[in-house]
Amino acid sequence: MADSERLSAPGCWAACTTFSRTRKGILLLAEIILCLVILICFSAGTSGYSSLSVVEMVLAIVFFVIYMCDLHTRAPFINWPWSDFFRTLIAAILYLITSIFVLVERGNHSKIAAGVLGLLATCLFGYDAYFTFPLRQQRHTAAPTDPTDGPV
């Protein structure tokens, strides 16, 4: 009964709006929108570079849906923090390389805009990778300082 209520339209919309207000949700939405804008700029100029934007936009949508629907808790055999970290790290590196190539070539205005937006995407994906780094989120507990064998 609870599963059917969770999959209803108002519940789905509430889950979407609730997740999209979190830091991870905002980052994923920003990645999706930025990849779409870069895709439009590359399509107007040179379509050879547009595959990176398509792949990263699709991956960001997939991760948004996975986190929004709490599917990451239902599939514990996949290490989601590491998967998301490597996705964002690789995206940042590839956007940096692609943007440098595009800006060095000096094409038309849409190509230059795509290169500059690609550098912005590098910063956004790098920021996301920094905050999703799994070892950064682990908290170490303090070692007990009380003697366990009694007073000395």
From Swiss-Prot:
This is Proteolipid protein 2. Residues 19-137 form the MARVEL domain. InterPro entries: Marvel, MARVEL-CKLF_proteins. The lineage of its organism: Eukaryota, Metazoa, Chordata, Craniata, Vertebrata. It is a multi-pass membrane protein. The keyword Hydrolase does not apply. Glycans are attached at residue 108. May play a role in cell differentiation in the intestinal epithelium. It is found in: Membrane. The chain crosses the membrane at residues 25-45, 48-68, 85-105, 112-132. GO terms for cellular component: membrane. Keywords: Glycoprotein, Membrane, Transmembrane, Transmembrane helix.
